């Protein structure tokens, strides 16, 4: 019995060597963008890196990255430094380098259609007007990659300039609403890596 247990553990280890995920948080580099709505993906990735004790400090393919293991999954964390609209120029070559298929590329980004702190988990889909997602879709060659969109709140009125809104800083109450959801975001990311995206949706969407 012990022999079979050892063999099974070795087999599981071999299988897990091919289980690798790229998790990318979207945002803009430069300190002046810290704390802005459009950098919600960067902030969420930093929260995961802290929780998982993964240092995101190496540079490759126009991005800051680090790697580790989370619940048996190999994980590469990435913050593209290309600016938002060219996020795919960092994500696609990083995925290619590690031979990570698109359905194992999990993207964290902001969502102006959701209230601050709301999460929207999707297995695939269009860019929905998000230029970062648009770039990733173009560079990966399709829409079939999961994403967790983080609510940042809608413009206060239709005439408000969109760029000014997403590049504006969060008020403290909105920043807290988002930070309070980081435990849910982490749990959702783990479920997605476990192949349980539908469960992540039912538990954490909204």
What residue spans do the PLM features occupy?
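Hydrophobic alpha-helical segments within soluble ligand-binding/sensing domains
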Residues: 128-132
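Nucleotide and nucleotide-moiety/phosphate-recognizing core
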Residues: 2-124, 134-148, 155-161, 168, ...
């Amino acid at each position: 019995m012990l022999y079979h247990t050892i063999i099974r553990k070795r087999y599981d280890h071999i299988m897990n060597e091919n289980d690798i995920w790229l998790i990318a948080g979207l945002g803009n580099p430069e300190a002046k963008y810290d704390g802005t709505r459009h950098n919600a993906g960067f902030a969420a990735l930093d929260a995961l890196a802290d929780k998982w004790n993964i240092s995101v400090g190496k540079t490759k393919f126009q991005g800051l990255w680090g790697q580790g293991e989370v619940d048996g999954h190999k994980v590469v964390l990435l913050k593209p430094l290309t600016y938002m609209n060219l996020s795919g120029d960092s994500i696609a070559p990083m995925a290619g380098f590690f031979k990570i298929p698109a359905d194992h590329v999990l993207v964290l980004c902001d969502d102006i259609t959701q209230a601050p702190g709301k999460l929207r988990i999707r297995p695939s889909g269009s860019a929905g007007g998000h230029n970062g997602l648009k770039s990733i879709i173009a560079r990966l060659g399709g829409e079939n990659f999961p994403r967790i969109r983080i609510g940042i709140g809608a413009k206060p009125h239709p005439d408000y300039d969109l760029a000014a809104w997403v590049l504006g800083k969060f008020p403290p109450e909105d920043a807290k609403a988002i930070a309070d959801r980081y435990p849910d975001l982490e749990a959702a990311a783990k479920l997605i890596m476990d192949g349980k995206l539908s469960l992540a949706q039912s538990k954490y969407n909204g």
